[in-house]
């Protein structure tokens, strides 16, 4: 019987010594939203609580300024 190996989650922001997550950094923010536009939870990404709050705030600001979409493209 094969053993399933789960890779340990780690916080990328802690590893890179990020002080604050910027709402203008769209490339980073896109990694933390789903295809439908939802914010990915920290239990999936491994992000620490401090950075998850900053991430959510930055994504919401970017959405408000139309830098990120609220939802997907709704292609039919």
Swiss-Prot record:
Pfam annotation, one family: Ribosomal_S18
UniProt keyword list: Ribonucleoprotein, Ribosomal protein, RNA-binding, rRNA-binding
Any one Gene Ontology BP term: translation
Domain of life per record: Bacteria
Family: Belongs to the bacterial ribosomal protein bS18 family.
Role this protein plays: Binds as a heterodimer with protein bS6 to the central domain of the 16S rRNA, where it helps stabilize the platform of the 30S subunit.
Protein name: Small ribosomal subunit protein bS18
Upper lineage: Bacteria, Pseudomonadati, Pseudomonadota, Gammaproteobacteria, Aeromonadales
């Amino acid at each position: 019987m094969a053993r399933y190996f789960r890779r340990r989650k780690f916080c990328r922001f802690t590893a890179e010594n990020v002080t604050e997550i910027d709402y203008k950094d769209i490339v980073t923010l896109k990694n933390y939203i789903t295809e439908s536009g939802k914010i990915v939870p920290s239990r999936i990404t491994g992000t620490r609580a401090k950075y998850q709050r900053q991430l959510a705030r930055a994504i919401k600001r970017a959405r408000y300024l139309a830098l990120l979409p609220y939802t997907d493209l709704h292609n039919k």
